[in-house]
Amino acid sequence: MARILWVSDAGRATGFATVTHALGERLAAMGHDIHVLAVGWDAKYPVPGPLQLYRAEAGPARQYLGLDRTLELVEHLKPDIVLTVEDPPMVWRRFMDNRFDPDKKVLKRQPIISYLPIDGYGVPPQWLTLKRLVRVVPYSRFGAEQLDMDPDEAIPHGVEPIWRPFSKAERLTVRAKLGIEPDAFVIGRVDSNSRRKDFASTWKTINMALENGWLPEDKTVALFHTKLIETSIGVNLQTLISRGMGKFMVTNEVDWPVEQVVELVNCFDVTLNNSRGEGWGLNILESLACGVPVIAPDSSSIPEVVGDGGVLIEGRAEMTNPYGVDWILSDPLPMALALREMYNADATLRAKLADAAIKQAAKFNWDESAKRFDVVIKEELAKA
């Protein structure tokens, strides 16, 4: 089996870290020796499990992303494979434009596998060049198509068994703990507060539904697991909420234990996602696994994740991000109308929607994804 230097988030509550532990721990169980350059890990406490974590900021330059540790760890560990779970610009920077590795020693030494999220349309030529430098594995079929690759080369994310639908009694218990009425209509979202995630449009959608009387103000609760104020990369939700109607609950946290987040999601009647683009959409998939239907834009990788487990709404316009990639802006009006339809659904229809969400989530399995990565790793070792 292979010794692998894994480069990504680890030991923290981010999407990249979830992927690191879900895939990395399964590959370790198959016999691979996995060492992680753990971006964002503070090393305050050990992380249980088979992965050996190395703090990214422990290098001589204390560089947050561990750019100064990549070559150091390659020379120390002598891995058979380097495997990254990072955005394409970061992969390029780490291996092609890294002032701590000007001779590109890491790129030349061993095979590199890059598990890539593609969250928009019209990718830069630089990203296409990565295919000649590393083994690119897209998250999604959408991402593969944008990279001019066979969609079957994509390896999807999975969902852990802890993400499950609660019984009615369990749901009511959790709602009571949070001070939410048993018969409230709860619109939820678990996500980072960033420009791409566009929480402002989530607020606008809910507020529009309330202002037009499509949802009852006294029965509607918006429950967000995100930072309340994140003006450097996202939006000041506190300001938006003060401008509108309804009851909003914001955890102002991002690092809850996963068990607590599962409880939170099981309070939702519907997940409302207004993201401008997703490389995969892990929080969407986890909502579906809890039997919570999703309303989301019909763009990027989102349709292949949502499938029959929710309602997809066409976006209203394109916007170009700093990398020259086009995102799609969600349309609050039809999404607000979809919320109205979800609220008006009777018990039978809601049960059907929940069942469809669970069946859609069951299509994605971390065990199967890890097996496919094992094949990719062995293919790269055979070429080396």
What would you call each of these model-derived segments?
Residues 39-42, 218-235, 250, 254:
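Glycosyltransferase donor-sugar binding loop
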Residues 164-180:
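A short helix/loop element that forms part of the nucleotide-sugar donor recognition site in Leloir-type
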